[in-house]
Regions:
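Polar helix-capping/helix-linker motif
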Residues: 95, 249, 269-270
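Catalytic or ion-translocation cores adjacent to nucleophile or general acid/base/metal-coordination motifs
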Residues: 217, 224, 260-279
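Short beta->alpha junction loops/turns
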Residues: 209, 245-246, 269
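Dynamic "connector" segments at or just before major functional cores
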Residues: 1-214, 218-233, 259
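Acidic/histidine-rich, metal-coordinating catalytic segments
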Residues: 168, 237-247
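A short acidic (Asp/Glu
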Residues: 176, 249-255, 274-278
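A structural signal for short, well-ordered beta-strand segments and their strand-loop junctions
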Residues: 164-166, 242, 264-266
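Active-site loop/helix belt of alpha/beta enzymes
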Residues: 240, 248-262
Length: 279
């Protein structure tokens, strides 16, 4: 059966006054072209721009090639495409698709690539909460944490009647001698033990942790922070917090009593009969 090709061109948002189109008539191919749709999604919610706004750039503006917004966008889209290792960016810094996503197609200086290499991105990731002489990019942890919840709230046109916050800790296996490396008996490997909080498909919190702690460590504090932020927009919302996860019931009670509106604590399905409705 003869293959029928669609010769139409599909246009995307221009970058630096250059048109960006997708064609299906052959030529040089890329396996990452679908990422252009990811870029369109980002522009709809402004994720990268808002994430970049959580950083402070203390570098001399006239001397830099890669802005914080470009660095953050390059790293976010790189991870989304499966390029988790910074060393990959020594090649990806020349990739036209990633350049389109980052919004930077050409370098200002002749001796630079359009995007950053691993060393520059490493300095971004090793930044601190405060600017120092040797750390010129700082991040605001509270703003980054709040951004997850802001995106969740904005994803709802109308507040739902009830939401369920699902807390979970899982293993992030390590294959080298990374800082904070510990062996975890349950997972039978060296790993980190990150804490995640979801509401359905929405990620509300992601906390990197070492594996030498209890799985529930910090869970109540994170839940309290998220609930307080949700309450500013949805003050009458019923919030369900599963009572599993190894969190001490007494600590859950403390969290519940600290809320002005209805908060609902329940055990796992195997103990559903013992759930409690708290005010």
């Amino acid at each position: 059966m003869q293959t029928e090709c669609n010769a139409d061109l599909f246009g995307f948002a221009p970058v630096e006054r250059r048109p960006v189109v997708a064609g299906f008539d052959g030529g040089k191919m890329t396996s990452d072209a679908g990422a252009l749709l990811l870029g369109a999604t980002d522009r709809a919610i402004g994720l990268v721009d808002r994430f970049a706004a959580c950083f402070t750039d203390g570098r001399a503006a006239e001397l830099i090639e890669h802005t914080v917004r470009t660095l953050v966008g390059q790293r976010v889209f790189g991870i989304a495409l499966g390029y988790e290792d910074l060393v990959d960016h020594d090649q990806l810094r020349h990739d036209p698709t990633l350049a389109v996503l980052a919004g930077k197609l050409s370098a200002r200086r002749k001796d630079c690539a359009p995007l950053a290499g691993k060393s520059t991105l490493n300095r971004l990731e090793l930044g601190r909460a405060e600017l120092t002489r040797y750390h010129r990019i700082a991040w605001d942890g509270a703003k980054i944490e709040a951004l997850f919840v802001e995106l969740f709230l904005e994803a709802h046109r109308d507040p739902p009647k009830q939401i369920i916050l699902d807390l979970d800790a899982t293993d992030d296996p390590l294959h080298g001698h990374q800082e904070g490396r510990f062996f975890h008996g349950y997972y039978d490997c060296y790993c980190y033990l990150p804490l995640y909080i979801f509401c359905g498909r929405h990620l509300l919190a992601a906390k990197q942790r070492c594996a030498n702690i209890d799985a529930a460590a910090g869970a109540v504090e994170e839940a309290a922070r998220i609930v307080a932020q949700i309450r500013t927009q949805w003050p009458k919302m019923r919030i369900v917090l599963p009572g599993r996860f190894g969190v001490c019931p007494r600590r859950l009670d403390e969290l519940v009593r600290g809320q002005w509106r209805r908060f609902f604590v329940r055990a796992g399905q195997e103990r559903a009969a013992g759930r409690r409705d708290c005010q």
